[in-house]
């Protein structure tokens, strides 16, 4: 006498556990997404605004750069209220021949070793930029970027947790931040 053939589960029975796990994962992902802040999607190049001076600049959104950098000309260190500060100029985006003077406390000085082997000191300041609808503050190195296409480079330190970059797009969102008191 032969043993009865084992009954094979139906397609529905075999897929049901997998489908339930999938739905649970999707529900959990949706809840996590709703509970956290939404991420703004921006292009590889965007207009950003230096909040304190209300100056709009075109910036490269660079996910490959750890920190942000700003084209700074005629840098001059000085002391104010017992702290080290720096005065520098940026090119006026409305008039290439004009300059706008900014002053910030120096957070630190970083030494960068260049490809040529020489090292370069760069002052680092805290900068608040309006990027899309976000006011984001992060350390920004001051360097001469006049030979580069963009005066401003926004790195991951400014974008992390707030911005996703679509590298195939540009100028997706103009700077439009709420006032300081909101």
Regions found by a protein language model. Give the residues of each.
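Bacterial N-terminal signal peptides
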Residues: 14-27
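Pepsin/retropepsin-fold aspartyl endopeptidases
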Residues: 32-182
